[in-house]
Amino acid sequence: DVDVQCMGEPREGATAHAENYPEGANAALRVFGADLSMAAAIPKVDLVHSHTWYANLAGHLAGLLNDIPHVVTAHSLEPHRPWKAEQLGGGYRLSSWTEKTAFQGADAVIAVSAGMRKDTLDSYTNLDPDKVHVVKNGIDTEEFKPDPGTDVVTGLGIDLDKPSVVFVGRITRQKGLIHLVRAAEKFDSETQVVLLAGAPDTPEIAKQIGDAFAHLQSGRGNVL
């Protein structure tokens, strides 16, 4: 059996914990509040597994509290994301501390690629390499599979007869969207630029991308 604890809005198959306490506190502290709630809510289990710094504290505390193994999965690393200080302020030091503490205390670390394993060992040099394993992300091929239909694509205004450059992801410095938008000014005019982007890290980066996107639209067509 698997018991799932998560953050955010309630959802089927999981126990959700809101990031709203302490009210008005730095975002990292509110994540910690949700982590404490998670650690307290975990039932009797044999092992706890956490993903990213957002849940690492919950996993670390639950492991200590219940004397059970804690496994962490490394998707990204806080030492490689200094721009998160723009979003979290001093909370970036807290997120970095949490990740480091959880990784160093974990019974095993799962990296989602060989490159992530190397980065993890480079970032946390006292980790035992034998405890760091590679398990690549899996995909449910029943839910996610090629769809030959074109209704959604054409409904967005995309011309199937023209080449397209497509971005899908969050608006965050880590993904380098601003560089794509600026480079798109030099694309062939027949090339469509399709941006499926959202969830900006900060209002500042949202404005930066919005301004660059508007400038791109003013200078060429085929921008969606």
Question: Residue ranges of each PLM-predicted region?
Answer:
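N-terminal subdomain of nucleotide-sugar transferases
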Residues: 1-12, 185
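Conserved donor-binding/catalytic core segment of Leloir-type glycosyltransferases
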Residues: 159-175, 181-185, 194
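Nucleotide-sugar donor phosphate/pyrophosphate-binding loop at the beta->alpha transition
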Residues: 69-71, 79-101, 118
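Nucleotide-activated donor-binding/catalytic signature segment of Leloir-type glycosyltransferases, i.e.
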Residues: 162, 194-197, 206-224
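Short His-centered aromatic/hydrophobic patch
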Residues: 50-55, 74
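A short, charged, and often flexible helix/loop element on the N-terminal side
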Residues: 7-43, 86-87
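Carbohydrate-associated surface elements
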Residues: 8, 115, 138
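A short helix/loop element that forms part of the nucleotide-sugar donor recognition site in Leloir-type
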Residues: 145-158
